[in-house]
């Protein structure tokens, strides 16, 4: 999600929390954890903010197809769900609504909005589960997180 023009403090906070939940979820994607650990990381960051975690759309595995198993919900319980195995490639994509967790698809059958037409945010990275730790494949890795970067995009952390 990118803000267009000047945005107010409430929108900036929604964007910040959504992006932080992405990086915390990525950190949870380690060998030996489970898919539920990823959703639990999102929930832990969002808890107490008043934001709704969109549950009807999920992250997913990637491989021969764009959308593969496992589904990676943005809610979960630590230690639950399919195990995370070395070599898995996942799209992790937290989505939050400022005032609801409900969504609606418009008549074009593509555009998704929050059910109350309020603000929402979505951040996503594709990552690999490796024995060295979570490796972000699709963009730079911000400082302060225990993540590996792509050797191409982040030569210093790759």
Regions found by a protein language model. Name each.
Residues 1-158:
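Active-site neighborhoods and metal-handling regions in enzymes and metal-associated proteins
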């Amino acid at each position: 999600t990118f803000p267009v023009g000047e945005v107010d403090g409430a929108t900036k906070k929604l964007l910040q929390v959504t992006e932080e939940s992405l990086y915390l979820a990525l950190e949870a994607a380690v060998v030996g954890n489970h898919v539920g650990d990823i959703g639990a990381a999102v929930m832990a960051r969002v808890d107490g903010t008043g934001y709704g975690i969109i549950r009807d759309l999920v992250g997913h595995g990637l491989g021969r197809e764009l959308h593969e198993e496992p589904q990676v919900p943005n809610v979960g319980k630590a230690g639950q769900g399919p195990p995370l195995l070395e070599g898995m490639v996942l799209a992790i994509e937290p989505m939050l609504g400022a005032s609801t967790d409900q969504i609606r698809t418009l008549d074009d059958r593509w555009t998704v909005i929050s059910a109350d037409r309020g603000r929402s945010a979505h951040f996503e990275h594709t990552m690999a589960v490796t024995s060295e730790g979570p490796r972000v494949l699709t963009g730079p890795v911000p400082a302060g997180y225990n993540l590996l970067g792509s050797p191409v995009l982040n030569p210093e952390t790759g």
